[in-house]
Swiss-Prot record:
Gene: rpsB
Region Disordered, annotated ranges: 223-260
Keywords, comma-separated and alphabetical: Ribonucleoprotein, Ribosomal protein
Organism: Pediococcus pentosaceus (strain ATCC 25745 / CCUG 21536 / LMG 10740 / 183-1w)
GO BP term (any one): translation
Membrane-spanning residues: none
Pfam families noted in UniProt: Ribosomal_S2
Entries under InterPro entries matching the protein: Ribosomal_uS2, Ribosomal_uS2_bac/mit/plastid, Ribosomal_uS2_CS, Ribosomal_uS2_flav_dom_sf
Residue stretches in coiled coil: none
CDD domains attached to this UniProt entry: RPS2
Protein name according to UniProt: Small ribosomal subunit protein uS2
GO MF terms held by the record: structural constituent of ribosome
Basic and acidic residues compositional bias, start-end: 241-254
Cellular component terms (Gene Ontology): cytosolic small ribosomal subunit
Family classification: Belongs to the universal ribosomal protein uS2 family.
Length: 260
């Protein structure tokens, strides 16, 4: 059973590619036909490849991996933030700052600054400062929040990137490649699939298409994490059982000795 049905993909407009004059020939294997000057994506392939992507992300999450959701184009911003939060993961939905991955130590310093400013606001420090200074600090805080708020609590560089539109997120993808971080991406007919490790051929411009697939990747994280939680719980039960068995064994040995 596929994680997304053909009907859902059709309703969300996942099959609509770009105009035929704006295409990347490497996407030819994923194109079904051309209609009114627009390429139509082969949804039979998309269904299978979404399953691949789902299982890949689920496995990463099951191993306590960190997933970074990336989509800075307007159509993706809301879905990227909401679905990453729902999955308990991290996101970049405004401009990707160069070095976010490759210069992680410097980025962490800027995140620390953001946390310090938030603490100053909460503990009443701002109330004791001149209004002009507070205005400047608030401006700085808002800017840092906009670009780094989604990765503020990310414990380390991610184990996988989920990207909406690799053409738009070139810098993020190049940084991931440098660090050997796998990339799962929604790839439209105008993108280069060779840049992506796990491809999802899809319309990456329609809000409904972006929401549908981003939500499914969030579901994969949640399912993977639930599997991990269940494994931990069963391990605890097993440890409890073996502990009880050991106690029972000791007890029976002691009782046997007493009888002698």
């Amino acid at each position: 059973m596929s994680v997304i049905s053909m009907k859902q993909l059709l309703e969300a407009g996942v099959h609509f590619g770009h105009q035929t004059r704006r295409w990347n020939p490497k996407m030819k294997p994923f194109i079904f036909t051309e209609r009114n000057g627009i390429y139509i994506i082969d949804l039979q392939k998309t269904v299978k490849l979404i399953d691949n992507a789902y299982n890949f992300v689920k496995d990463v999450a099951a191993n306590d991996g960190v997933v970074l959701f990336v989509g800075t184009k307007k159509q993706a911003q809301t879905a990227i933030e909401e679905e990453a939060k729902r999955a308990g993961q991290y996101f970049v939905n405004h401009r990707w700052l160069g070095g976010t991955l490759t210069n992680w130590n410097t980025i962490q310093k800027r995140i620390k600054r953001l946390k310090d400013l938030k603490a100053m606001e909460e503990d009443g420090t701002f109330d004791r400062l001149p209004k002009k200074e507070v205005a400047l600090l608030n401006k700085q805080k808002d800017k840092l929040e906009k670009f780094l708020g989604g990765i503020e609590d990310m414990p380390h560089t991610p184990d996988v990137l989920f990207v909406v539109d690799p053409r738009k997120e070139q810098i993020a993808i190049k940084e991931a490649q440098k660090l050997n971080i796998p990339v799962v991406a929604m790839v439209d007919t105008n993108s280069d699939p060779d840049q992506v490790d796990v491809i999802i051929p899809s319309n990456d411009d329609a809000i409904r298409a972006v929401r549908l697939i981003t939500a499914k990747m969030a579901d994969a994280v949640i399912e993977g994490r639930q599997g991990e939680d269940e494994e931990e719980a069963s391990q605890e039960v097993a440890e409890g059982v073996s502990k009880d068995s050991l106690e029972d064994l000791k007890k029976s040995v002691e009782e046997g000795s007493n009888e002698e």
